[in-house]
């Protein structure tokens, strides 16, 4: 019975109609030469419930590396990244790589690696997945 309570709480918190989802991304609409647009002045709030992903485009040219970042809808971002997949060859001249992500500021600089943080997050994820499976199972019974 407690599982049903957890499922109801989960649904109440995350799946209510009208629940607004907004993400923050780095944005520089014009290509920036050797500037990856990852400083605070490039942070924007994306359009609620429309632009649910961050997009990053990296183009390697003879003059240097060009960056363009923006908010995007998941459909537009995934279509763009799939369309340019064959042109993505990091380190090669005229390479164009487009990537999409859906966590806050994920199109910014890569976080510095820490040895133990990745393994510390895994148990929480496993627990969350277990609770979701239990909730779904109890809902079908």
Curated annotation (Swiss-Prot):
Membrane topology term: Lipid-anchor; GPI-anchor
Cytoplasm in keyword set: no
Molecular function in Gene Ontology: acetylcholine receptor binding; acetylcholine receptor inhibitor activity
CDD domains: TFP_LU_ECD_LYPD1
Annotated S-S bridges: 25-54, 28-37, 46-71, 77-100, 88-97, 101-106
Protein origin, superkingdom: Eukaryota
Record bears the keyword Manganese: no
Residue ranges occupied by any UPAR/Ly6 domain in the UniProt entry: 25-107
Proregion residues excised on maturation: 118-141
Subcellular localization: Cell membrane
InterPro entries: LY6_UPA_recep-like, Snake_toxin-like_sf
First-listed, main subcellular location of the protein, grouped into a coarse class: membrane
GO terms for cellular component: extracellular region; plasma membrane; side of membrane; synapse
Lipid-acceptor residues (GPI-anchor amidated serine): 117
Signal peptide limits: 1-20
One Pfam family, short name: UPAR_LY6
Glycosylated position list: 45
UniProt keyword annotations, A-Z: Cell membrane, Disulfide bond, Glycoprotein, GPI-anchor, Lipoprotein, Membrane, Signal
GO biological process, one term: negative regulation of protein localization to plasma membrane
Function: Believed to act as a modulator of nicotinic acetylcholine receptors (nAChRs) activity. In vitro increases receptor desensitization and decreases affinity for ACh of alpha-4:beta-2-containing nAChRs. May play a role in the intracellular trafficking of alpha-4:beta-2 and alpha-7-containing nAChRs and may inhibit their expression at the cell surface. May be involved in the control of anxiety.
Quaternary structure and interacting proteins, as annotated: Interacts with CHRNA4 and nAChRs containing alpha-4:beta-2 (CHRNA4:CHRNB2) and alpha-7 (CHRNA7) subunits.
Protein name per its UniProtKB record: Ly6/PLAUR domain-containing protein 1
Organism whose genome encodes this protein: Homo sapiens (Human)
């Amino acid at each position: 019975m407690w599982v049903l309570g957890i499922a109801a709480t989960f649904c109440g918190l995350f799946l209510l109609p009208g629940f607004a989802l907004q993400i923050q991304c780095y944005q520089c609409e014009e290509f920036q030469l050797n500037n990856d647009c990852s400083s605070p002045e490039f942070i924007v709030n994306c359009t609620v419930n429309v632009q649910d992903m961050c997009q990053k485009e990296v183009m390697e040219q003879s003059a240097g590396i060009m960056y363009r970042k923006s908010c995007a809808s998941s459909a537009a971002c995934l279509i763009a990244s799939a369309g340019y997949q064959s042109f993505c060859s990091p380190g090669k001249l005229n390479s164009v790589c487009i990537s999409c992500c859906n966590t806050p500021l994920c199109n910014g600089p890569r976080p510095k690696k820490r040895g133990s943080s990745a393994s510390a997050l895994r148990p929480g994820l496993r627990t969350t997945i277990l609770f979701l499976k239990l909730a779904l199972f109890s809902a079908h019974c």
